[in-house]
């Protein structure tokens, strides 16, 4: 059985810390049932993940992208931005329509804010908490 070391993978992923992150993420994927792309040879999941990276059966960039998506709590959706020409045309046409007015916020000084906070009444204590 050939041993896979970090030196076998370091030419594929330049940073050792990034290599550890990618290999551990891939090992977790394997333990969750993802199919492996190399022969197992009775190796454990971290070794299989390192062998996949060393043999270039998986792209490190794809693994990095997948790792980032797995750590995101809010996924951004790329929506196409409207064309500026279309926006200008719709603004010119929409002047006659009943458009909601733009919302403006009042400005408050720090003293007014502090006075407002001091004037707040604390909620009554309840046994529910």
UniProtKB/Swiss-Prot annotation:
Keywords: DNA-directed RNA polymerase, Nucleotidyltransferase, Transcription, Transferase
Broadest EC class assigned to this enzyme: transferase
Region ranges (Disordered): 76-101
Known partners and oligomeric status: The RNAP catalytic core consists of 2 alpha, 1 beta, 1 beta' and 1 omega subunit. When a sigma factor is associated with the core the holoenzyme is formed, which can initiate transcription.
Enzyme Commission identifier(s): 2.7.7.6
Biological process, per Gene Ontology: DNA-templated transcription
Keyword Protein biosynthesis: no
Function: Promotes RNA polymerase assembly. Latches the N- and C-terminal regions of the beta' subunit thereby facilitating its interaction with the beta and alpha subunits.
UniProt catalytic activity: RNA(n) + a ribonucleoside 5'-triphosphate = RNA(n+1) + diphosphate
Family of this protein: Belongs to the RNA polymerase subunit omega family.
This protein's name: DNA-directed RNA polymerase subunit omega
InterPro entries assigned: DNA-dir_RNA_pol_omega, Pol_omega/Rpo6/RPB6, RPB6/omega-like_sf
SMART domains: RNA_pol_Rpb6
Cross-referenced NCBIfam families: rpoZ
Any one Gene Ontology cellular component term annotated for this protein: DNA-directed RNA polymerase complex
Single Gene Ontology MF annotation: DNA binding
